[in-house]
């Protein structure tokens, strides 16, 4: 038997002539980690007759391949080196462009001015203003630190490239180190560039995510639970602190609603675009016939603001406050005392519910803070100067907008209807891989804002 094998992976694109059934198949140089494959092994794109039952190991001990191990290793490493050198050049250009646009001299001057203000004897006379100044100072220092780190990382990678060019042989460990640096640098640069698109007054804050099961019965409640996990996984991957502070369980499965707090810098700015209706199409696990089911869940996102940052006042006559027993499992307060609080802003219909505190008063205080935060964001979005100017009909229409489809059957696809961004890797999305969608939405939002500015 004779055939042609195209190798994937480190030696991508190479073709080797194979005669007979080799005991060992060389796919990788010997100085790299070994990987033993389980057998029998069916090679992709081969006929059923091309089935190997012989041991196949990533090594180079016995082989019928007509190739020199030493030459292959050297050639493979040089290809990696050329790729690395190109990646370093691209990263270096990105860093240079970002640092140039940041205007480092002006940045340093702004830091100096704010530090001077912070040392003034009257600095703390206005605590709110003082906190804003310190927050701005920390932001500028973080920005300066990142710009410095970018320069250091790209210089380290450039040094390795120069050393490799001067050496007689290629050091695998040095190449791997440089590749790791560039990979981490590119991730940091992507995130840094993304933050430049965040300019809203609350974008730097943490986020509160409200998830509510919509039409679809038990399937919708299960879908709401899946969304809750998706956002928790996203927060964990961003190294944010996530906490479910309120949850109402479904009757058979899933949840009716949940409130998730995500603490971390820019959490609200990143995830605010998730607000809207999320639609799922799948074979229902709760239907004995496995029929295809379409369900919906609503997502609201508000900034996680400290009490002192919520400075608006709402007339008592505009609030409808009701008390209910807290739901949940166990606990002396559960279903015995009416500690759960629901507050509705009558003019707009905006409502919040709080159950996590042990007392009615504490829940009322926290619910009022969340309600004010919601109204502040809505006012900012509608460009209203006062809360009383908010249009309730516009609020309902915006929150009811469908933003994304998740199709599990008859094919797999996640598609954002606003940006057109899509992927067939639905498993990764449900595991919190939302960054591509977030990036696409922020760019889309920025483009619309620029177009609106030009028109006006």
UniProtKB/Swiss-Prot annotation:
Query: Per UniProt, which keywords does this protein have?
Result: Chloroplast, Plastid, Protein biosynthesis, Transit peptide
Observed effect of gene inactivation? High chlorophyll fluorescence phenotype (hcf) and severe lesions in thylakoid membrane complexes, predominantly in photosystem II.
Q: Which GO terms describe its molecular function?
A: translation release factor activity, codon specific
Q: Mitochondrion: present as a keyword of the record? A: no
**SUPFAM superfamilies associated with the record:** Release factor
Description of what induces expression: By light.
Secretion signal span: none
- InterPro entries reported in the protein's UniProt record: PCRF (IPR005139), Pep_chain_release_fac_I (IPR000352), Pep_chain_release_fac_I_sf (IPR045853), PrfB (IPR004374)
Q: Where in the cell is it found?
A: Plastid, Chloroplast stroma
> Gene Ontology terms, cellular component aspect?
chloroplast; chloroplast stroma
Q: Which domain of life is it from?
A: Eukaryota
> Which Gene3D superfamilies does its entry note?
3.30.160.20, 3.30.70.1660, Release factor
**What processes does the entry annotate via GO biological process terms?**
plastid organization; RNA processing; translational termination
Q: Briefly, what is this protein's role? A: Directs the termination of translation in response to the peptide chain termination codon UGA. Required for the proper translation, stability and normal processing of UGA-containing polycistronic transcripts in chloroplasts.
**PANTHER family to which the protein is assigned, alphabetical:** CLASS I PEPTIDE CHAIN RELEASE FACTOR, PEPTIDE CHAIN RELEASE FACTOR 2
* Entry's family note: Belongs to the prokaryotic/mitochondrial release factor family.
The identity of this protein, by name, is Peptide chain release factor PrfB1, chloroplastic
């Amino acid at each position: 038997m004779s055939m042609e094998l195209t190798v994937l992976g480190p030696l991508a694109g190479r073709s080797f002539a194979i005669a007979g059934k080799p005991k060992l198949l060389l796919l990788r140089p010997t100085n790299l980690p070994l990987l033993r494959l389980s057998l029998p092994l069916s090679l992709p794109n081969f006929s059923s007759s091309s089935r190997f039952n012989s041991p196949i190991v990533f090594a180079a001990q016995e082989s019928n391949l007509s190739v020199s191990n030493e030459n292959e290793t050297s050639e493979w490493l040089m290809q990696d080196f050329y790729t690395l050198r190109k990646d370093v050049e691209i990263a270096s250009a990105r860093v240079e462009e970002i640092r140039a646009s940041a205007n480092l001299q002006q940045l340093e001057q702004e830091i100096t001015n704010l530090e001077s203000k912070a040392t003034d004897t009257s600095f703390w006379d206005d605590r709110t203003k003082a906190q804003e100044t310190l927050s701005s100072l920390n932001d500028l220092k973080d920005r300066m630190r990142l710009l410095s780190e970018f320069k250091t990382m790209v210089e380290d990678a450039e040094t390795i490239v120069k050393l490799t060019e001067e050496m007689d042989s290629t050091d695998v460990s040095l190449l791997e180190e440089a590749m790791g640096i560039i990979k981490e640098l590119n991730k940091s640069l992507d995130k840094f560039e993304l933050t430049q698109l965040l300019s809203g007054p609350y974008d730097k804050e943490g986020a509160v995510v409200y998830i509510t099961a919509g039409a679809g019965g038990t399937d919708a409640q299960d879908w709401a639970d899946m969304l809750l996990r998706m956002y928790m996984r996203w927060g964990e991957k961003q190294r944010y602190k996530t906490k479910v502070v309120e949850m109402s369980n479904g009757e058979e499965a899933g949840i009716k609603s949940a409130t998730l707090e995500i603490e971390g810098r820019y959490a609200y700015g990143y995830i605010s675009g998730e607000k809207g209706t999320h639609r799922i199409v799948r074979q229902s696990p709760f239907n004995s016939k496995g029929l295809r089911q379409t369900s919906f869940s609503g997502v609201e996102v508000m900034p996680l603001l400290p009490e002192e940052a919520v400075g608006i006042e709402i007339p008592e006559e505009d609030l409808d406050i009701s008390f209910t027993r807290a739901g949940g499992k166990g606990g002396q307060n559960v279903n015995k005392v009416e500690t759960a609080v629901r507050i509705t802003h009558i003019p707009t219909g905006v409502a919040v519910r709080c159950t996590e505190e042990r007392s009615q008063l504490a829940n009322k205080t926290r619910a009022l803070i969340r309600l004010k935060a919601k109204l502040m964001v809505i006012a900012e979005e509608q460009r209203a100067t006062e809360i009383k100017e908010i249009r309730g009909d516009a609020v309902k229409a915006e929150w009811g907008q469908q933003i994304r489809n998740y199709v599990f059957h008859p094919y797999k696809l996640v598609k954002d209807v606003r940006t057109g961004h899509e992927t067939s890797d639905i498993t990764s999305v449900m595991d919190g891989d939302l960054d591509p969608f977030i990036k696409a939405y922020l760019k889309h939002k920025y483009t619309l804002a620029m177009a609106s500015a030009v028109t006006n």
